């Protein structure tokens, strides 16, 4: 439990996206520090492929990829979760990179004044087949695959919207 300091992140991608993100946002809105991570319960709970839910961590330049360094990147918020087909890189608010240490030296926290305008930048990419997959696209969000970029396709294009949630 996050409120008892028993876990550092909430796992995702194995239940409907609206449920998972609702739990995560409520946890954050209650003032708890909690990251989000991808998971695949293969082969324990269901037999979907390994890597169904993925978490990507940015390591500092020149830092060796080790489990410890990767976990510290997740803890510090230098990460994002996806389905392996959609990516958000170099996300910044007013030049403050996700997972950086803020004025109070806490990783991933940037102070901003109430009503302050923020310039948000990021590199985003989505990998979609040329033709829509209507089998996935038309399923209710309560059916697998819960997180899949196909659900976001704009019309018959290979484009998806980028949404910034402001709280």
Report the location of each language-model feature:
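Glycine- and acidic
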Residues: 6-9, 145-147
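The substrate-binding groove and active-site-proximal loops of carbohydrate-active enzymes
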Residues: 8-18
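Extended catalytic-interface subdomain
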Residues: 1, 14, 37-39
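C-terminal functional module detector
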Residues: 25, 29-35, 40-167
